[in-house]
Design a protein with these regions (language model features):
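Short glycine-enriched, charge-decorated loop/helix-capping segments at active-site entrances
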Residues: 20-24, 192-195
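Conserved core of the sugar-phosphate nucleotidyltransferase
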Residues: 57, 65, 106-197
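Conserved beta-strand scaffold positions in the cores of enzyme catalytic domains, especially
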Residues: 24, 69, 125-127
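N-terminal nucleotide-binding beta1-loop-alpha1 segment
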Residues: 1-18
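Short beta-strand/turn micro-motifs composed of small residues
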Residues: 9, 52, 100, 129-130
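Short glycine-enriched loop/turn motifs at secondary-structure junctions
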Residues: 17-19, 99, 169-173
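Conserved N-terminal catalytic core of the sugar/cofactor nucleotidyltransferase
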Residues: 1-4, 26, 30-120
């Protein structure tokens, strides 16, 4: 089974109020994206695909020819960003890891376990989740009675539902790291609604 990895790095990181692109800020002595890239590179069978946007020069200068680059011209959400990699990956990989480029604490071992879990299960998607505080801004992982993930509910959406308190009390949070069965991913990504980035 061939594994590909996509790192989403097209965002501006405007909340950081910096001229430096968010993924290029240093953590632990090196740029955030380099931590994630090296973890993905150790698990992937192909050079990781990095989705870039405006200000891509710094990312390209840092990663050089170790990465394959695709450009997301319009910021229309993470599903759309992932879709930008279809032309370079469709038919080349059996599994596709997708993660954000600003996750410096993500470890290669965690990615390897996620890939193995998706491969061994009958699920088309496997995701990493974390246990956190009820006050977190991360999406909540909602599970059915049998333990299967039924949905991921973002905080803004949870606040508009009748069971807001119940949803926001969930401590299992979506880490934003996924492993997909490749064919399923490419067949279903176009069905996602486009969302203008915040």
């Amino acid at each position: 089974m061939t594994v590909a990895a996509i790192l989403l790095a097209a965002g501006h990181g405007t909340r950081m109020n910096s001229k430096t692109q968010k993924v290029l800020h240093g953590v632990g002595g090196k740029p955030m994206i380099l931590h994630v890239f090296e973890a993905a590179e150790s698990v992937a069978d192909l050079p990781p695909v990095v989705v870039v946007g405006a200000g891509e020069e710094g990312v390209r200068a840092l990663l050089g020819e170790r990465a394959t680059y695709v450009v997301q011209e319009q910021r229309l959400g993470t599903g759309h960003a992932t879709l930008m990699a279809e032309d370079v990956l469709r038919g080349r990989a059996d599994q596709v890891l997708v993660t954000y480029g600003d996750m410096p604490l993500l470890r290669a071992g965690s990615l390897a376990k996620l890939v193995a879990e998706q491969r061994q299960s009958s699920a088309v998607i496997a995701l990493l989740s974390v246990l956190g505080d009820a006050g977190s801004s991360f999406g909540r992982v909602v599970r059915a009675a049998d333990g299967a993930v039924s949905e991921i509910v973002e905080v803004a959406e949870a606040r508009q539902r009748a069971n807001t308190a119940e949803l926001l009390a969930i401590r299992e949070l979506n880490a934003g790291v996924y492993c997909f069965e490749a064919g399923w991913l490419w067949d279903n990504l176009p069905r996602l609604p486009l969302r203008q980035a915040r």
